[in-house]
Amino acid sequence: MSSPKVAIVVLNYNTQELLEKYLPDVLATDYDNMDIWVVDNASTDKSVSFLQSQFQQQIHILISSENRGYAGGYNWALDQIEAEYYVLINSDVRVPKSWLRPLVNLAKSNPQIGAIQPKILDDKSVQYFEYAGACGGYIDKWGYPFCRGRIFDS
């Protein structure tokens, strides 16, 4: 039985340097039924020509003629992409090779799961969680945010 079809969708706006650094990790993902889509949100840098010259055979590129913003860019792209599961990631995301299958298995295991969000590690200090965009976090007694599952040093 084949794995469910997954579309990994990366929204890009002027992030050529980030794509150079992080897209190879996404391409190395160990999963047998996926397509990788980079959606260009009307970039003014050389992102599109870079993608076409370096990754044309490995990815699909959607080019928007206007910057639709973050949600608008993803919505525009998802209207054009067919898959059973969609993974929306930013161009600055580093993933290990085996990251995708556990997410798909979890989603398949419970039809009530509608979205899955990772704990985001700080790229410069991987022992720490990144706060930006954290969902379901807490605020400590001093007003500092922290994510569920964060390990505190004693």
Regions inferred by a protein language model and the residue ranges of each:
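N-proximal low-complexity "stem/linker" segments adjacent to membrane-targeting elements
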Residues: 1-28
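Short alpha-helix within the catalytic core of nucleotide-sugar-dependent glycosyltransferases
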Residues: 23-24, 48-49, 75, 83, ...
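A conserved acidic beta->alpha catalytic loop
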Residues: 25, 40-49, 66
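Short beta-strand/loop segment that forms part of the nucleotide-sugar
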Residues: 33-42, 62-64
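Glycine-rich, basic loop-to-helix element that forms the pyrophosphate-binding segment
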Residues: 63-81, 91
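Short aromatic/hydrophobic "clamp" motif used to bind/position activated sugar donors
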Residues: 86
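Conserved donor NDP-sugar-binding/catalytic core segment of glycosyltransferases
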Residues: 96-132, 137-140
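Short, flexible, basic/aromatic active-site loop/helix in glycosyltransferases
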Residues: 137-154
